[in-house]
Amino acid sequence: NSAWTKSAVTVDASYVAPDGTSTASKLTSTGAAGATGVYDSYNTGAGKSLTCFMKAGSSGVYGWIEGIVGGASPYAVFDLESATVVRSRSCDASIEPVGNGWFRCVLANTTNAMSFFSVGGSDNTYTSSPWGSSDLTQGKFIYAWGAQLNRSDLGGMVNNPDRGDSYV
C-alpha cells in the first residue's frame, strides 16, 4: 500500500496472501542504516490492537510490530519459524497459525497512546524498541499482509460465510 512509508526496504506486493489473493507484500532489506520495515501514522489512545499477517521469508529473520510513541513504545517480536512471541513490551502479544506458513501476529491492549504503527523484520530479537534498533542483512526478507489497527475491546475478526466474504 502506497500509504505506508518505507524504511530500508523494498516492497513487492504480488505474493499469495492468506486469503489466496496475490496481495501480500515481500519486504526485502536494502541494507541501508535504520529501521527495516514500513510505517504509517495514526494518532490513537491506549487500548488498541495492532495486527499483521506475517510469513517467514529468509531463514533466521524475526517479524515485529510496534506502536511508536516516543517513550515506552509497545512492541512485539515474533519468531516466524517456531511460531513464538520472542519478546514484547507494554502489550499482550500473540501469534496464531492460519495456514500455508502464515501467522496472525497481534500486539493487543496497548498501555500507551501511539502515533505510528510499524511492521518489519530483523536479524535479532532486540533488547529495546525494534524501530529504534532493528537491522536486517541486505537481501533478507519477510512477507506481510493485512496490517490493521483495531480497538482492543472489539475482539478478533470473525468470518461471516453468509456475506460471501472470505476472511482469515
Q: What are the functions of these language-model segments?
A:
Residues 1-168:
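Extracellular and organelle-lumenal recognition/adhesion modules and their flexible linkers in secreted
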